């Protein structure tokens, strides 16, 4: 079932589509949309696009397989076309090798602001000691899973979420020469494919983390957009 805030946004989008009748509609959402619990939501979206005169294709793509981005981020992408010829010529991009590594998005050698580090003073009890004991590698990603530490064996960042900056088990952790810390906001944007030169807005860290978690993988969007352009030429 579509959540209230999501439903409001979607039907406002439908209103704009109905009025403007764009040639292309390009949507992105969480992978769970194709799962059993949300199959009715996906059906509503697809039926609405059809009612508005669009033929569509959709596919679940992972950023680390289709965007050369070291993040395990699966999302459903929906592309709708008003023109039948455009629709016939469009296809989603093929998977590509993952050549970027964690070191391309995380500066393990740099000392960052103290606020990002996990220290004994900040984390009382045995949590800090457990992190130190189990986070043995300096080129890996870890997560604190409430009662244990888990290393990401795929060598990529787990899916970034909008509540990552709030702590808890959603925070990817790294160990560097300067200590154990969470990813900085800029590193989170790097993880979404934004360039190192990207300038962050003058916002609180919590809002920046939320923006990064709600963002899209730049390279996946770029590759789909390239195929859309080819289809409508």
Language-model features, listed with the residues they occupy:
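Class I S-adenosyl-L-methionine
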Residues: 1-159
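C-terminal target-recognition/interaction regions appended to catalytic cores
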Residues: 122-233
């Amino acid at each position: 079932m579509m959540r209230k805030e999501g439903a409001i946004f979607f039907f406002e989008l439908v209103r704009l589509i109905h009025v403007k009748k764009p040639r292309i509609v390009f949507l992105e959402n969480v992978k769970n949309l194709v799962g059993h619990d949300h199959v009715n939501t996906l059906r509503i979206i697809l039926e609405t696009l059809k009612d508005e005169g669009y033929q569509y294709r959709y596919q679940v793509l992972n950023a680390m397989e289709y965007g050369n981005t070291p993040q395990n981020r699966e999302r459903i992408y929906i592309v709708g076309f008003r023109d039948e010829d455009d629709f016939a010529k469009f296809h989603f991009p093929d998977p590509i090798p993952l050549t970027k590594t964690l070191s391309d998005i995380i500066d393990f050698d740099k000392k960052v602001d103290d606020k990002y580090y996990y220290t004994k003073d900040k984390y009382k009890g045995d949590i800090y000691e457990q992190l130190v004991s189990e986070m043995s590698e300096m080129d890996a990603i870890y997560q604190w899973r409430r009662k244990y530490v888990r290393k990401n064996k795929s060598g990529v960042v787990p899916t970034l979420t909008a509540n990552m900056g709030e702590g808890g088990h959603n925070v990817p952790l790294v160990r560097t020469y300067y200590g154990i810390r969470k990813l900085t906001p800029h590193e989170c944007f790097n993880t979404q494919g934004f360039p190192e030169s990207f300038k962050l807005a003058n916002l609180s860290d919590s809002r920046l983390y939320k923006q990064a978690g709600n963002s899209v993988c730049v390279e996946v969007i770029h590759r789909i957009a390239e195929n859309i352009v080819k289809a409508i030429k």
